[in-house]
């Protein structure tokens, strides 16, 4: 797997992780029920599933294709 593809996939998975974490935080801090999402526990469960899938994909990619080396630009 080439470096650019790995970086792109890593960015994608990190974005999915951050998105899920942010939404879970919003649900946990706001005690207002959103009409479109009355099943808060179900929604958080779905978000946790997305979070775990993205983390697992990153772990599998690192296991089989190595870690991403971030190059700093000065």
Regions found by a protein language model. Give the residues of each.
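Extended, charge-rich alpha-helical interface modules
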Residues: 1-74
């Amino acid at each position: 797997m080439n470096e650019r593809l790995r970086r792109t996939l890593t960015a994608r998975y990190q974005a999915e992780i951050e998105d899920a974490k942010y939404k879970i935080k919003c649900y946990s801090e706001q005690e207002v029920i959103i009409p479109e999402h009355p099943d808060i526990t179900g929604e958080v469960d779905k978000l946790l599933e997305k979070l775990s899938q993205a983390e697992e994909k990153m772990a599998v990619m690192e296991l089989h294709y190595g870690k991403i080396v971030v190059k700093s630009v000065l």
